[in-house]
């Protein structure tokens, strides 16, 4: 079939239909979202939970959500910035932090639902493939499906680290090991292989420790600049594994979020100026009809007096 170039005339623009705003902005893949939220028709009013992972420049966000006609509803969430409470004060966006955030969300959600004692998950991460539904026989675990957004699902991506943390924490998320670090695809008909030790090294931050040692030997100045936060917090390559190991135990001991105290909002009016704790802005007092009428009469009188003086 010959290539036919689209003629962008008046009829083309008249019939043109724009895509959804979030599709135009490159934020949502609606084809993938439709498949994610579509529930079986024989499950009446049963929400389909999604394990949502989003990675920014400064944090890893994990949320469990479900879709409604009015919009998505949040069930539980965890943020890698919370890991500072558990002893992880640096590297809040790496693979290990993503795993810890997923673990924190899983333990928090199960405690919220009253399932924490029944579904404890894998207490000592080993990198081995683990499915909670194969362990529990009496009761079905809390099930979610992974929502990665628009990221490239490459081997070793941090979203799969967060998913691994949630699975080890006791959530049931259907998956395989094909996107975990340590997976190697077989060539020329050979079988695929998976090395859990490589994955375990990523979970405990051993790849960071190895890079720290290498950089310290080869370029000490760059090491001082790149790992300044580690040096400031007195974290050396030999203490990284212990830091994460203790953090995982603390997360299991107390996954509850810290409740923030509601601050008093102080607003003071000084004439037409509103002053708050952070800023100030102008908001004129609304006048009633009688006051406005008096102001108009005064202005008329002022103009009349001025004209009389000039004469």
Curated annotation (Swiss-Prot):
Subcellular location field: Cytoplasm; Nucleus
Keywords recorded for this protein, A-Z: Cytoplasm, Nucleus, Ribonucleoprotein, Ribosomal protein, RNA-binding, rRNA-binding
UniProt GO molecular function: 5S rRNA binding; structural constituent of ribosome
UniProt-listed Pfam families: Ribosomal_L18_c, Ribosomal_L5e
CDD domains hit by this protein: Ribosomal_L18_L5e (cd00432)
Complex formation: Component of the large ribosomal subunit (LSU).
Protein origin, superkingdom: Eukaryota
Protein name: Large ribosomal subunit protein uL18
Entry function: Component of the ribosome, a large ribonucleoprotein complex responsible for the synthesis of proteins in the cell. The small ribosomal subunit (SSU) binds messenger RNAs (mRNAs) and translates the encoded message by selecting cognate aminoacyl-transfer RNA (tRNA) molecules. The large subunit (LSU) contains the ribosomal catalytic site termed the peptidyl transferase center (PTC), which catalyzes the formation of peptide bonds, thereby polymerizing the amino acids delivered by tRNAs into a polypeptide chain.
Signal sequence interval, chain numbering: none
Family in the record: Belongs to the universal ribosomal protein uL18 family.
Source organism phylogeny: Eukaryota, Sar, Alveolata, Apicomplexa, Conoidasida
InterPro entries assigned: Rbsml_uL18_euk (IPR005485), Ribosomal_uL18_C_euk (IPR025607)
GO cellular component assignments: cytosolic large ribosomal subunit; nucleus
HAMAP family registered for this protein in UniProt: Ribosomal_uL18_A
An individual GO BP term: ribosomal large subunit assembly
């Amino acid at each position: 079939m010959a290539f036919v170039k689209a003629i962008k005339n008046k009829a083309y623009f008249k019939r043109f239909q724009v895509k959804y705003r979030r599709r135009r902005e490159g934020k949502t893949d609606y084809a993938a979202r439709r498949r994610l939220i579509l529930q079986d028709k024989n499950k009446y009013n049963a929400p389909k939970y999604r394990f949502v992972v989003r990675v920014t420049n400064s944090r890893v966000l994990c949320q469990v959500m479900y879709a409604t006609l009015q919009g998505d509803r949040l069930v539980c969430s965890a943020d890698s910035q919370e890991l500072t409470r558990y002893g992880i004060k640096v590297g809040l966006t790496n693979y290990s932090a993503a795993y810890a955030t997923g673990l924190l969300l899983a333990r928090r959600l199960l405690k919220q639902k009253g399932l924490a004692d029944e579904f404890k998950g894998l207490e000592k991460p080993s990198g081995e493939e683990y499915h909670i539904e194969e362990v529990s026989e009496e009761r079905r675990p809390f099930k979610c499906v992974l929502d990665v957004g628009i990221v490239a699902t490459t081997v070793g991506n941090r979203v799969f680290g967060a998913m691994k943390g949630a699975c080890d924490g006791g959530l049931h998320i259907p998956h395989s090991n094909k996107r975990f670090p340590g997976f190697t695809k077989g060539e020329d008909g050979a079988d695929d292989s998976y090395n859990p030790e490589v994955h375990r090294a990523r979970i405990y931050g051993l790849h960071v420790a190895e890079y720290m040692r290498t950089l310290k030997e080869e370029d000490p100045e760059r090491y001082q600049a790149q790992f300044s936060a580690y040096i400031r917090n007195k974290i050396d390559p030999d203490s990284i594994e212990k830091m994460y190991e203790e953090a995982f135990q603390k997360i299991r001991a107390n996954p509850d979020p810290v409740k923030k105290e509601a601050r008093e909002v102080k607003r003071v009016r000084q004439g037409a100026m509103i002053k708050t704790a952070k800023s100030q802005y102008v908001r004129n007092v609304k006048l009633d009809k009688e006051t406005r009428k008096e102001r108009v009469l005064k202005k008329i009188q002022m103009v009349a007096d001025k004209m009389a003086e000039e004469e």
